From Swiss-Prot:
Belongs to the GreA/GreB family. One of its GO terms (molecular function) is RNA polymerase binding. HAMAP family: GreA_GreB. PROSITE patterns: GREAB_1, GREAB_2. Keywords: Coiled coil, DNA-binding, Transcription, Transcription regulation. The keyword Transmembrane helix does not apply. One of its GO terms (biological process) is DNA-templated transcription elongation. It comes from the Bacteria. Gene3D superfamilies: Transcription elongation factor, GreA/GreB, C-terminal domain, Transcription elongation factor, GreA/GreB, N-terminal domain. The gene is greA. It comes from Rhodospirillum rubrum (strain ATCC 11170 / ATH 1.1.1 / DSM 467 / LMG 4362 / NCIMB 8255 / S1). The lineage of its organism: Bacteria, Pseudomonadati, Pseudomonadota, Alphaproteobacteria, Rhodospirillales. This is Transcription elongation factor GreA.
Length: 157
């Protein structure tokens, strides 16, 4: 069983989602199915079919989250240090074409959220950054062509 690297915050978010699915969403969908059944003929009951579909999604997500959280390898990034990019690092890069500066935290795939500045260690830019230091340049192959970035900051915690 392969371990999944994760930050403490990432694990906490997944556990909170799992708890909500089990204690709020699952009971609500069971009630919705019961109410829809009371409306009679199930073959033409859109409410019933929608509730069953939602139940299927919820149960699938619960199974996925139980699997991921059971295999989580929590890495306390507050105890990490150094000048080399690795899991947990917060990294600033400068787009060598646009001169635009962007900051990312390198996290596990299940906690990545680009809008929040968290990118997966397995993403193209995440892979390119691993092992790099301030001043290093990286090339990231994108659908529109290669992009080049310079690492301008690496920090932990």
């Amino acid at each position: 069983m392969e371990k999944i690297p994760m930050t403490p915050d990432g694990l906490a978010r997944l556990e909170a989602e799992l708890k909500s699915l089990k204690s709020v969403d699952r009971p609500a969908v069971i009630r919705a199915i019961s109410e829809a059944r009371d409306h009679g003929d199930l073959s033409e009951n859109a409410e019933y079919h929608a509730a069953r579909e939602r139940q299927s999604f919820i149960e699938g997500r619960i199974k996925e989250l139980e699997d991921v959280t059971s295999r989580a390898e929590v890495i306390d990034i507050s105890k990490l240090s150094g000048d080399t990019v690795r899991f947990g690092a917060t990294v600033s890069v400068l787009d060598e074409d646009s001169e635009e500066q962007t900051t990312y935290q390198i996290v596990g795939a299940h906690e990545a959220d680009l809008k929040a500045g968290r990118i997966s260690v397995a993403s193209p830019i995440g892979k390119a950054l691993i092992g790099k230091k301030v001043g290093d340049s990286i090339e990231v192959k994108a659908p529109g062509g290669s992009k080049f970035y310079e690492v301008t900051m690496v920090r932990f915690g």
